[in-house]
Amino acid sequence: MQLRCSFRLYPNGPQRQALARAFGCARVVFNDGLRARETARTGGDAFPTTGDLSTTLITEAKKTDERAWSGEVSAVVLQQALRDLDTAYRTFVDALKGTRPRVGAPRFKSRKDNRQAVRFTANARWRITTGGDLSLPKVGDVRV
């Protein structure tokens, strides 16, 4: 059984910055993964798996000076961005094979798009506090 909970959040100033950082990092990981897969597809190279992308774009990237900021957000958010990319790409490839209705290729996420969302799974250890707030990792207790 899968359970989904959607919450309307009312974050304060520092929490807004932490959430904006999470949105931005998830977008960057999604776009980098899409670029790697598109490069492999057009070049005829081996298709990078989600595990390979996770190692390259999340684990190793946190150790570099250029991407050290990706360590400031929960790793679950970044992993879910790669899972979303995997789902979108798998749907696209299945459509090319004819096993699904026709859909377009996954597109890069824009910084200017207002639709921003991240997912925290049960492994992210989010919880509802006794005061009714939502406790998110590396964000804090956010009013719901």
Can you say where each PLM-predicted feature lies in the sequence?
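Nucleic-acid substrate recognition interfaces
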Residues: 1-144
